[in-house]
Amino acid sequence: MRILVNGGGPAGMAFAMFAARSGRGDEITVRDWTGPGDTYGFGVILPPAAVEVFRDAEPDLADELNSHITAWDRLSVHRHGRTASIPAPRLGAMDRRTLLKVLRRRCAERGVRFEHGAVDPALGDHDLVVAADGARSVTRRHRAAAFGTTTREIGPAYIWLGADRALEHLRFLVAETPDGPAVAHAYPYSPDRSTFLVEADGAPPPAVLAEWFAGPLGGARLLENRSRWSRFQEIHNRTWSAGNVVLIGDAAHTAHYSIGSGTRLALDDARALADALCAQPRLADALKGYEDARRPIVEHTQRIGRLSATWFTRLPDVPMERLLDDLATRGGQISWRDLATEGSGAVPVRG
């Protein structure tokens, strides 16, 4: 089977590695518009279950990824000059560039080919085309009617930034501004870096944001990397495959960033698709099996993400202890069990 993977992010790289290891693909090519090391973003959240996706197939890879992860088991809120924290399910993050470097090396060791340049929406003569080219997928957009793609904006305006300091753990920082509260979602991903995502009205420049959050930043600088203000696009597709083209990761679905599930969903998709191709000799059956396995989990995660986004849009001004409780359950709409399950790739069983 000749396989083309459009997109060299976590979903595309992980799928190529799994497919090459299984021997299902005689020739696997990853095509990406960026070159090696030329990536965007800062740290990505990897709950323990995301790393365990690799454990049985690549135990040394799981160990290598764990060695790069900065972990925490608390979350805190800072508002009105006060900080309070509570224990939280164990989570961690790592540099997105490091994750891709590790996965790319594993792909190369298994004979995966790499091409760089604009993603070509044409199918060519490949037996399978895997659309792993992100939320703005060119591959999907050229077949939007076949996939039944719909999008909707959820949550407030936001911008992805970094900080040149490792914060202690997952922190939610609230700054009072003339346009209302601005909220930073911040977490460490290396010994000297943190992701620093800010939600605010009016699209203020990073220099203004640095002033608003000067206290919690403690002298750290805010960093930009293709950073721009936008609204989150929740993506749905009626079907995840059309002919020999299949969607994975953000090309197939997105869940709001406030629950930190995007990379885990991408890695789980990659493993599930590779497993389905091994289990079913007919391509159509394999693609159906992949979607049947993943869609319930994805739709559950998207629902949790919508509840979370709505809560942040209506951030309550309540005493600190109440705010912590509200944050942990997004105003009583979800539970710690929901959030812990977000890291396990499973849909909770409701009693």
Swiss-Prot record:
E.C. number: 1.14.13.223
GO terms classed as biological process: antibiotic biosynthetic process
Pfam families (alphabetical): FAD_binding_3, Lycopene_cycl
Keywords: Antibiotic biosynthesis, FAD, Flavoprotein, Monooxygenase, NAD, Oxidoreductase
InterPro entries: FAD-bd, FAD/NAD-bd_sf, PheA/TfdB_FAD_monoxygenase
Family (UniProt): Belongs to the aromatic-ring hydroxylase family.
Protein known as: 3-hydroxy-4-methyl-anthranilyl-[aryl-carrier protein] 5-monooxygenase
Primary gene name: sibG
